[in-house]
């Protein structure tokens, strides 16, 4: 059995175009705001907003400005927590809302990393709008599952997997031929999620999750061609922490009894 080239082509991300990430321009420095009425606390809230932009120039200015604040950040954090308590009347809200207050360097590192990941995503998709538009693979899965009744009160995939398998089997470009195809498809979905996450996306669409789950289920049904392919599946299951999934015992049995030479 050969790899499904139509499947591979559909489940491939756009190539990297470094010049396409220019839509992430340096923003203006956020304007200071009166939030709590406490000048020092409000100053830190403003500096945190500057840091969250993820742009090095604004971060450098914020970190330099923070040196002029003489009150310990821990004390300012307590004052901010007290403000939140007065506003919301909830000690839990106050505790969580003031958590990490004033930890500008840590926040800066996180913001820079998030911005780096955004650049990577936009180097493939050009704009945030394109990034969140249905990819050709998503559109194909959505079309294939049109009319399939969804199951209520399901935590993850809310399609019945038998119907999903029947629908995808009718579309050669959605059906993996080999275990390597299955891994390719799952890698596509995981990478797409990874590219979208820095922009604050939620869960994958149900039709995308259905195909990811279908590829995983097919790992138990397609015979391995070689020892190397079996090992690749084992490594994949360990890497994605899928050993506890319902299909995993059948997958392991398939890898052992597959008859590869």
Model regions and ranges:
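Sequence/structural signature of long amphipathic alpha-helices
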Residues: 1-261
């Amino acid at each position: 059995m050969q790899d499904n080239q139509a499947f591979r082509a559909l489940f491939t991300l756009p190539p990297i175009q470094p010049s396409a990430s220019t839509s992430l321009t340096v923003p203006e420095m956020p304007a200071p705001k009166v939030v709590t009425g406490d000048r020092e606390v409000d100053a830190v809230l403003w500096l945190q907003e500057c840091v969250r932009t993820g742009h090095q120039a604004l971060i450098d200015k914020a970190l330099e400005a923070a040196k002029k604040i003489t009150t310990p950040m821990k004390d300012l954090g307590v004052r901010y927590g007290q403000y939140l308590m007065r506003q919301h009347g909830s000690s839990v809200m106050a505790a969580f809302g003031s958590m990490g207050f004033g930890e500008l360097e840590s926040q800066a590192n996180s913001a820079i990393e998030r911005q780096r990941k955004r650049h990577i995503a936009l180097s493939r998709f050009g704009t945030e709008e394109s990034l969140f538009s249905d990819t050709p693979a998503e559109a194909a899965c959505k079309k294939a599952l049109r009319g399939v009744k969804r199951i209520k009160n399901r935590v993850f995939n809310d399609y019945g997997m038998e119907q999903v398998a029947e629908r995808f089997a009718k579309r050669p470009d959605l059906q993996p031929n080999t275990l390597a195809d299955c891994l390719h498809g799952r890698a596509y979905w995981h990478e797409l999620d990874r590219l979208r996450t820095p922009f604050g996306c939620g869960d994958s669409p149900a039709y995308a999750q259905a195909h990811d789950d279908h590829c995983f289920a097919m790992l138990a049904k397609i015979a391995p061609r070689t020892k190397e392919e079996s090992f690749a599946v084992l490594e994949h299951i360990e890497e994605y922490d899928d050993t506890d999934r319902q299909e995993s015992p059948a997958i392991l049995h398939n890898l052992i009894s597959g008859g590869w030479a």
